Amino acid sequence: MTDLIRSDAATLAAKIAAKEVSATELTQACLDQIEATDDRYHAFLHIGAHEALSAAAAVDTALAAGERLPSALAGVPLALKDVFTTVDMPTTCGSKILEGWRSPYDATLTLRLRAAGIPILGKTNMDEFAMGSSTENSAYGPTRNPWNLDRVPGGSGGGSAAALAAYQAPLAIGSDTGGSIRQPAALTATVGVKPTYGTVSRYGLVACASSLDQGGPCARTVLDTAMLHQVIAGHDAKDSTSLETEIPDVVGAAKAGASGDLRGVRIGVVKQLRGDGYQPGVLASFEAAVAQLTALGAEVSEVDCPHFDHALAAYYLILPSEVSSNLARFDAMRYGLRIGDDGTHSAEEVMAMTRAAGFGPEVKRRIMIGAYALSAGYYDAYYNQAQKIRTLIARDLDEAYQSVDVLVSPATPTTAFPLGEKVDDPLAMYLFDLCTLPLNLAGHCGMSVPSGLSPDDGLPVGLQIMAPALADDRLYRVGAAYEAARGPLPSAI
């Protein structure tokens, strides 16, 4: 069973299709691993054992009947971030205000996973409403990094990344608002991709910041991530921001990249995303990765994106502004937690009491910042200025891609930091998003692929690869080439 759960998803899918292993056997092995290890990691908030085994049995039945499998990943189980709605499991978004809530509908992404024959093992832990960089803001307790139990796994989707690193699941889904897929991937030596905004449906993704949120695939290899990306991407009429366009051949790009030939590929190193404030071991790993890309034949040059210096400030005005609007729906009137509804309090008092008890400190902080930024006296000075910076950041990237095909940077400024180190220092926590959030502001795509272990502390480091909107295939070509040249890494457990 140990060899089975440590296999990559592509290998497992091939074994299922060849009837060398059953989907039920694999799903049960993953459930057994969760049961044996999750008291240490707390990657999951809810386990859907019955539902997952039923989905796996359906794949086995179809195979036995000689039917064609619904996808290349049919029967390979997955961990789903608890921000996507599911009719058969609770959706809490890591918040007390939604404790025990069950959605009356599946997210479009959830439906696509089910249609592909992918068993959903359960819902993974996350920072409350995807607000955080460490998964310490969950109302249900923090997730621990399998590489070091005293360190964070990143956030907001630390549960999905930890589940992969702990071999609890071969596939996972996250959401990325400012780096919530890529940053945990970097800290756990897994692969995470933020697809182009609008290419993966947001219908049923509980909103944090609607113009920034994007669901995406996570796995332990670039090819596995590409295969999952192919399953979840595509136009959805239920999402008004969904792009009605052809999705790039990400699987083909990953397979082509595995040959290790990057001749003719132009790679830009972002000047603003390295230097002071970065951990020496992270920079050393990044420089080694750039040297490896050069050795594979890529043409590497430095690229200047001057407005990246203002990205953090712009992001932390735009995101809270959208949060303050989106989270107004949690009013204790329709669903979720309700405090003080005993006939002695007005509706306004019930709402205030419920929100005070149901939201955690970081969520309240961002609601307050957003309400202030959107207020009549400060809208132009803060929110409008932030949107102007957002436009300039997108222009920086558009200009950069005139001379290069992809950009690269460290995925995070440091390796995983100790639990509790930044939880009471919001500014330090926000700075951890420095490398990843510019892509969300621009709507472009990005990947974090493991680039080794830091010589400083032996913890994982991630290489971030960035590409223009609708050029997601470039991520997979470069990522797969680098992964093949880098070779295997030690495992967390």
UniProtKB/Swiss-Prot annotation:
Biological function: Allows the formation of correctly charged Gln-tRNA(Gln) through the transamidation of misacylated Glu-tRNA(Gln) in organisms which lack glutaminyl-tRNA synthetase. The reaction takes place in the presence of glutamine and ATP through an activated gamma-phospho-Glu-tRNA(Gln).
One GO location term (cellular component): glutamyl-tRNA(Gln) amidotransferase complex
Lineage, highest ranks first: Bacteria, Bacillati, Actinomycetota, Actinomycetes, Mycobacteriales
Name recorded for this polypeptide: Glutamyl-tRNA(Gln) amidotransferase subunit A
Single GO MF descriptor: ATP binding
EC number: 6.3.5.7
Catalytic residues of the enzyme: K81, S156, S180
Catalytic activity: L-glutamyl-tRNA(Gln) + L-glutamine + ATP + H2O = L-glutaminyl-tRNA(Gln) + L-glutamate + ADP + phosphate + H(+)
Subunit structure as annotated in this protein's UniProt entry: Heterotrimer of A, B and C subunits.
